[in-house]
């Protein structure tokens, strides 16, 4: 096998690397509820615009 063959990877089907944030592209903590697909950092920024409210 050539070295170039090692760089070709099949797309991930499950796990953290399978989903990206649609806003910033981060792979880590994704919020998928209601089909949001946002990382938690982006979700905290846009949550008020989406209609989410913080209750005490």
UniProtKB/Swiss-Prot annotation:
Cofactor binding notes: Binds 1 zinc ion per subunit.
Keywords, in A-Z order: Metal-binding, Ribonucleoprotein, Ribosomal protein, RNA-binding, rRNA-binding, Zinc
Cofactor: Zn(2+)
UniProt-recorded Gene Ontology molecular function terms: rRNA binding; structural constituent of ribosome; zinc ion binding
GO process terms (BP): cytoplasmic translation
CC annotations in GO: cytosolic small ribosomal subunit
PROSITE patterns: RIBOSOMAL_S14
Annotated InterPro entries: Ribosomal_uS14, Ribosomal_uS14_arc, Ribosomal_uS14_CS, RIbosomal_uS14_euk_arc, Ribosomal_uS14_sf
List of residues binding Zn(2+): 21, 24, 39, 42
Signal peptide positions on this chain: none
Subunit structure: Part of the 30S ribosomal subunit.
Function according to Swiss-Prot or TrEMBL: Binds 16S rRNA, required for the assembly of 30S particles.
Protein family membership: Belongs to the universal ribosomal protein uS14 family. Zinc-binding uS14 subfamily.
Protein name from the UniProt record: Small ribosomal subunit protein uS14
Organism: Pyrococcus abyssi (strain GE5 / Orsay)
């Amino acid at each position: 096998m050539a070295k170039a063959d090692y760089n070709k990877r099949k797309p991930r089907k499950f796990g953290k690397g399978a989903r990206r944030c649609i806003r910033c592209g981060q792979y880590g903590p994704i919020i998928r509820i209601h089909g949001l697909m946002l990382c938690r950092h982006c979700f905290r920024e846009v949550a008020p615009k989406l209609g989410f409210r913080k209750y005490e």
